[in-house]
Amino acid sequence: MMTTRRGRRGRLLIAVAAAALTLASAGCSSDGTATASGDLVGLFRLDPGTVDGSSVSGSWFRMVQPAGTPKDGPFMPNGDSPVQGGTVTLLSPGSEGGLRVGGFQSEPTPGFSSDGNSLSGSIMKPTRFFGVDFGASTNAVDPQTRRAVVAPSVRVEGGKLTANLTAWAASWNNQEFNQGAPKAPAAAGPQVPGVAQATRAWDWVQQKWLGQDDASSGDGPPATGTYDASSRHYTLEWTSLIVGGPFNGFTGVWHLEGTYEPSAAAPSTAPPSTTR
């Protein structure tokens, strides 16, 4: 009897230890990126771009010359950037600190200074590019194509980000360039079909609700990136063909990096949203 009891007791202790190890493992994985999934709404703060020797970190932009590739170039050198021979332009956070997801950060009125410098400074600080400041905004109606587009959205699955940034627009030298991913529909031709995320979305610059009926979700590949659920550190990267202007046929390469801050899609002071 003593041997049987000891055997049973030993097996019981082993089972308890195994269960404890299983729970501990589950607890560790719950804090990691593998279990994180769903839509992310709030502010994606930008880390300013920095350079250390040949290493670039933080947020940055570069432009691929026609027939080049985002990985190998050749890249268009920006005469106002000292980084890697001008082939990388460092970005800094704007007045909102970064990219708002679930709403818009539209181009202000006016959108340019008398010298053609962009005044879009909510997402990123306007940055010098060939003697003129360029900025970025997200708009319910794309400034270049005049197409209605959806508000930015980001989804995480197992530490990987997929983002709709169709509304992303760059402004420079009194000119507008859609730099979204997926790409906004062209100015001419049929509207690319898409399903709006919400009937209305808040504009953090204009401080009002904007309609999203019949807004396009764009065409082509989305922005992609990484997300660490523990630290909330993220990266987002995409490419977008430049159409029109002096850089027609070039491709913009955007890299955003920083920390995600969950928050509502509109401020608490916003009036109630109505569908009409």
Where are these regions (language model features)?
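C-terminal motif of bacterial Sec signal peptides marking the signal peptidase cleavage site
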Residues: 24-27
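Composition-driven, intrinsically disordered low-complexity tracts enriched in small residues
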Residues: 29-38, 44-45, 191-206, 267-276
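Sec-dependent N-terminal signal peptides
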Residues: 14-20
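Bacterial N-terminal signal peptides that target proteins for export
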Residues: 2-14
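N-terminal segment immediately downstream of the Sec signal-peptide cleavage site
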Residues: 30-97, 238-264
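Predominantly extracellular/secreted and cell-surface proteins with exposed
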Residues: 63-213
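Extracellularly exposed regions in secreted/surface proteins, prominently low-complexity, repeat-rich
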Residues: 209-218, 223-276
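Extracellular structured ligand-interaction cores
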Residues: 41, 151, 158-160, 233, ...
